[in-house]
From Swiss-Prot:
The keyword Disulfide bond does not apply. This is Flavin-dependent thymidylate synthase. Homotetramer. A motif (ThyX motif) lies at residues 80-90. The gene is thyX. The keyword Membrane does not apply. DUMP binds at residues 77-80, 88-92, 146, 173. Binds 4 FAD per tetramer. Each FAD binding site is formed by three monomers. PANTHER family: FLAVIN-DEPENDENT THYMIDYLATE SYNTHASE.
Length: 243
């Protein structure tokens, strides 16, 4: 199972964003004014400013996540979000565990439901590990031996995004039409934010959620899966109520 954890974020992120926003409107703005920004100031000003669509201020707050146990299929989609920073486990220097297929690869649930197909998958994955190991034993460097490994191999990655990019990421990847693995990573990232009392308000104020939450309607139109709008909104609401 993929593990996601919020490792670090801008100290006082909502105060930082509010303080930055007020430079445009407040004659009394100063560097020192940051220390005077209270939670009450945040609650008064930030929702109003965001309601005007002034979202560039969200870029002043950044969040760093660790993601472990997802496949390279997932991270290949993740790094398409270009306004972010990524550092991923290297297959050049980290040797793949050749002993355990299920510990080394992500196998979709759809495959696990078909016992005959699952057996074939495991045999092929095991064979790829054997060839990987054999290549290294024959003197092939890991950077070349890794070419035999499929995209399902598990990986680890550190991701840093600013709050505005996170909103864009959530809009696309929390949607039911997103691929299942990156969708679950996105929901776990959102949950990591919701767990923290000082961060939770920004989820509603900035509408951190799928696009149906952000826009108030589903932009996928005829591509929308049946019942998706209701399910997604309920999942988002339940997440907020949980914490």
């Amino acid at each position: 199972m993929v593990k996601v954890k919020l490792i670090n974020y801008t100290p006082k992120p909502l105060e930082t964003v509010t303080w930055a926003a007020l430079i445009s409107y407040w004659d009394g703005w100063s560097t020192e004014a940051f220390e005077k920004i209270s939670p009450n100031d945040v609650e008064i000003h930030l929702p109003r400013i965001l309601s005007y669509g002034h979202e560039s201020i969200l870029e002043h707050a950044t969040f760093t996540f660790s993601i472990e146990g997802c496949s390279r299929v997932c991270t290949h989609q993740l790094v398409r979000h270009r306004i972010a920073s990524y550092t991923q486990q290297s297959q050049r220097y980290i040797k793949i565990n050749p002993e355990d297929v299920e510990e080394t690869f992500v196998i979709p649930e759809s495959i696990k439901k078909d016992s005959e197909l699952l057996k074939e998958w495991k045999e092929l994955l095991k064979r790829s590990l054997e060839l990987y190991e054999k290549s290294i034993e024959r003197g092939i460097h890991q950077e070349d031996a890794r070419f035999i490994l499929p995209q399902s191999v598990k990986t680890k990655i550190v991701v840093t995004m600013n709050l505005r990019e996170l909103k864009h990421f959530f809009g696309l990847r929390l949607c039911e039409r997103a691929q299942w693995e990156i969708r679950e990573v996105a929901w776990k990232m959102l949950e990591e934010i919701a767990k923290r009392k000082e961060l939770k308000p920004i989820i509603e104020w900035a509408k951190l959620g799928p696009r149906c939450i952000q826009l108030g309607y589903c932009p996928e139109r005829e591509l929308m899966p049946p019942g998706c709008l209701k399910r997604t909104r309920e999942r988002w609401k339940n997440l907020l109520e949980k914490y």
